[in-house]
Amino acid sequence: AEQDRPAAETRTIPLYCSPAAAGYAAPVFGEDYELLTVDGEVPVGAELAVRIQGDSMEPYIRDESVVYVNHDPLRSGDVGIFCVDGDMLCKQYYRDSLGTVYLFSLNRSRSDADQVFTAGSGRSLTCFGRVMLHNLPLPI
């Protein structure tokens, strides 16, 4: 019966107010967050939430949607939240055998927003976490 089922466990995680851009860059997020109460609908390992701005990750991640992020190491094909030269981006990660890092837009009509980092490029790249999605095909 309905009353025999345990209540869904609720918890709070930070929802960052500064969006991660899926397309054009957004400013880096810091202390500007609100606590979001989540339940069993949210993946268990989610450590934070980020609102997405832009269309470069559609149709998998829509403009203005909220994604859930953990701190698991990224593997090629994973989607992550990145700080690139001081701006926040949501992109699909790929690293080749030479150490070149590619950040892809899943919406290939927005390939203009792809980023490439070669060794010695002098560009700053930090990963803030892995977006919790099912495996997606690389857009190559």
What spans do the regions from the language model cover?
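Short, positionally conserved secondary-structure boundary motifs
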Residues: 1-63, 88, 120-125, 133-140
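Short, well-ordered loop/turn sites that connect or cap secondary structure elements
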Residues: 61, 74-75
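Short beta-strand-centered aromatic/proline hotspots
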Residues: 79-80, 90-95
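Glycine- and charge-enriched low-complexity intrinsically disordered segments
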Residues: 96-140
